[in-house]
Amino acid sequence: MNDFVFLVVACLLTAGTEGKKDGYPVEGDNCAFVCFGYDNAYCDKLCKDKKADSGYCYWVHILCYCYGLPDKEPTKTNGRCKPGKK
C-alpha cells in the first residue's frame, strides 16, 4: 500500500512538467545556427525565441549553444547537416 501511495504522489509531482535540455538548436535539417563574429547577443536572442533560458556563441564550433531548451525543441545530433532537407 505504501508503495502505491508513493507511486501516485510521484506521478502527480511529475505530471505536466516539461523537461529542459542544453544543446545546439537546429532546424529540421540538423543544421545548427552559425554565429559569425562570436555574436553572443544574437545567440542569446535566438535561444530565448526558442523558449530557452539563455544562450551564447560557442567559439570553438562557432555555433549557438542554448541552456534550458524545451524538450520538444530539436538539438544537434551526431548526423550530418543536410541543408534543404526539412
From Swiss-Prot:
Signal peptide boundaries: 1-19
A GO biological process held by the record: defense response
SMART domains listed in its UniProt record: Knot1
Keywords: Amidation, Disulfide bond, Ion channel impairing toxin, Neurotoxin, Secreted, Signal, Toxin, Voltage-gated sodium channel impairing toxin
Pfam family of the protein (one): Toxin_3
Disulphide bridges: C31-C81, C35-C57, C43-C64, C47-C66
Domain remarks in the Swiss-Prot or TrEMBL record: Has the structural arrangement of an alpha-helix connected to antiparallel beta-sheets by disulfide bonds (CS-alpha/beta).
Described function: Alpha toxins bind voltage-independently at site-3 of sodium channels (Nav) and inhibit the inactivation of the activated channels, thereby blocking neuronal transmission.
Protein known as: Alpha-toxin TbTx5
Organism: Tityus bahiensis
